[in-house]
């Protein structure tokens, strides 16, 4: 009778899924995330940041919102503040926002901080779920300042699953190999926000220059060129520029949990 190989040896031999892959799939983050982009009125970005620093984050926490990260673009002509929240569910998010908006403490803060005019001219909100290949999404920090990168990919019709497969099977590991820190991978929940064709993710770098060096090495890696060619034998997985891939480099605010 043949002896059975231990599961760990079978995994190493590629005969069964690896234990880490199985664990990551089993531990997929079930929370709902919200990516919000605020456009500050001219001359009001500092005031908006002060309101978040001194009041809003605490009120968000009071009403069950998890603050993950707050950033401003390195190049910020539109005076954007970008942040990421987490909730137990979409219903929980609705209730949290309802309770926050009705809180007398928030109403008082809003009135005082907008005595000389509104701080925000436009708000964009996208609800997200984590992909099954996303790392654990948490508000990590580092001893040295870091630069974040928000990347948005849009696919041709019917190609999102193939793009996910390429990230799951190849890109995530190659990013790690080339020193690209990975904060989280997401897909929008709503059709009008790109549920069928959009992948959104956040990377973490030592600097914008370090990001450029890492991506140069990544793109030159034979493992990447082979994976890209194989995955695109039936056509590209992202739309042509400038719509297919968008990148925004971000600096954490001084009050951001993730830095």
Report each predicted region and the residues it spans.
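Bacterial N-terminal signal peptides
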Residues: 7-18
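Short S/T/G/P-rich N-terminal loop/turn motif that feeds into the first structured element of a domain
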Residues: 19-226, 230-259
